[in-house]
Every structure is written in structure tokens, then in C-alpha cells.
């Protein structure tokens, strides 16, 4: 697809280290004008996507992919700030409740920001500082 071919996105696959099993995909856009990283796309593999599978094989895939966006933001010198657009109202509420996301735009209630303490907490749960 054209989306996968976009050079302006950093694309990552999340795998289980022991088996190489693919469990999620993420695409991230550097937004220097906003001093943050936009999480363009994150998706769990079908077997771990609660919408598709009901019972998930693995939990925390989306959170780990968000944490990776926070890592990119830190690497770019943005302090961990990320924003994203929730696909559904349920996912929006999940990000607000569980990850400390805050609405980013009055025009689009699905645009959310994860920054500051919320970003540090999410990062520390899933990734380690080097």
C-alpha cells in the first residue's frame, strides 16, 4: 500500500523475542514543528486484538507501541511527547483512563496528547532507558 511505502514514517514491528512471532506494527511521524512524535498507526496482530479475537493471546501490545513512540520522541529531543488519533470512542476513553492521555484539539476530540508524567510512566512500564 502507499501508506507502507511512505518514507516520512518510521515503521516498526513488535515481535516476541523467543519466537520471532509478529504481535504488532507501528508507524511514527517526526513532527519537529510541534516538538513531538505523531503516532500515525499502531495495530496488534489479529490474535491479540480484543476487537477481532475476543480473548487476546498477548496483552499490552498497543501500550508497548505507544511506549516506542515515546522513545522516539525522547531520541528526537522532545522529552517523550506524542500525540495520536484514537480510532473509536472506546479506544479514546481507554487511552485517557489507562495512559493519562488528554484531548489535544477542540475540533477533533479523538486527537490525544500523552506527555509529561503520563509519558514517563508509560515508558517506564514497557521500555528501559539506555
Regions found by a protein language model. Give the residues of each.
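Conserved short alpha-helix immediately C-terminal to the canonical SAM/SAH-binding motif I
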Residues: 65, 90-91
Amino acid at each position: 500500500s502507499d501508506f507502507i511505502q511512505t518514507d516520512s514514517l518510521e515503521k516498526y514491528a513488535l515481535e516476541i523475542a523467543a519466537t520471532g512471532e509478529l504481535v504488532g506494527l507501528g508507524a511514527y511521524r517526526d513532527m519537529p514543528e510541534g516538538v513531538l512524535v505523531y503516532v500515525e498507526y499502531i495495530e496488534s496482530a489479529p490474535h491479540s486484538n480484543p476487537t477481532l479475537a475476543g480473548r487476546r493471546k498477548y496483552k499490552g501490545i498497543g501500550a508497548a507501541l505507544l511506549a516506542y513512540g515515546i522513545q522516539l520522541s525522547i531520541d528526537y529531543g522532545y522529552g517523550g511527547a506524542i500525540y495520536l488519533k484514537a480510532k473509536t470512542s472506546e479506544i479514546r476513553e481507554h487511552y485517557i483512563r489507562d495512559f493519562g492521555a488528554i484531548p489535544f484539539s477542540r475540533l477533533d476530540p479523538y486527537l490525544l496528547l500523552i506527555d509529561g508524567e503520563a509519558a514517563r510512566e508509560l515508558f517506564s512500564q514497557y521500555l528501559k532507558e539506555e
